[in-house]
């Protein structure tokens, strides 16, 4: 192969390489905290929504319960550790907790004797 042919091939290869573009996928931040499991609860005229919901989350991930209520009650989370929150007759109440032991966790209203949800907490 002559020097002229070798030079032509090299130029052609470099020209083709310059025509391509590389698009990288945006980096994901694996250290970002997980989105919390959020449950919106309404208590109105003795009716609770939702009831007996089945949900899932993982150990130590945040769980948020948002409550709009027209009556006072106690929200009790049967978990390790246990959590209790006083519900007032008002809108926009937010309660946050996490669970440190895997298993089934019941979230209940004590005065109305209703189970809002059972949360399956995975390791």
What label would you give each PLM region?
Residues 53-55, 82-87:
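Beta-strand-rich interaction surfaces with strong enrichment in secreted/lumenal proteins
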Residues 42-44, 58, 68, 78, ...:
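A structural detector for beta-sheet-dominated domains
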Residues 7-36:
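Short, low-complexity, disordered segments immediately C-terminal to signal peptides
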Residues 53-71, 93-101, 105-108:
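Beta-strand cores of secreted/periplasmic/IMS beta-sandwich domains, seen most often
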Residues 1-7:
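Positively charged n-region of N-terminal signal peptides that target proteins for export
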Residues 32-60:
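N-terminal edge beta-strand
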Residues 21-26, 35-37, 89-123:
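Extracellular/periplasmic metallocenter environments
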């Amino acid at each position: 192969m002559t020097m002229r042919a070798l030079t032509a091939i090299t130029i052609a290869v470099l020209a083709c390489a310059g025509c391509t573009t590389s698009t990288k996928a945006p980096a994901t931040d694996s250290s970002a905290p997980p989105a919390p499991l959020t449950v919106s609860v309404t208590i109105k005229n003795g009716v609770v929504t939702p009831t007996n919901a089945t949900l899932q989350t993982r150990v130590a991930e945040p769980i948020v319960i948002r409550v709009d209520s027209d009556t006072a009650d106690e929200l009790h989370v049967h978990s390790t550790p246990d959590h209790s929150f006083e519900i007032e007759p008002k809108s926009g109440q937010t309660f946050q907790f996490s669970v440190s032991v895997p298993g089934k966790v019941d979230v209940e209203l004590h005065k109305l004797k209703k189970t809002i949800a059972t949360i399956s907490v995975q390791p």
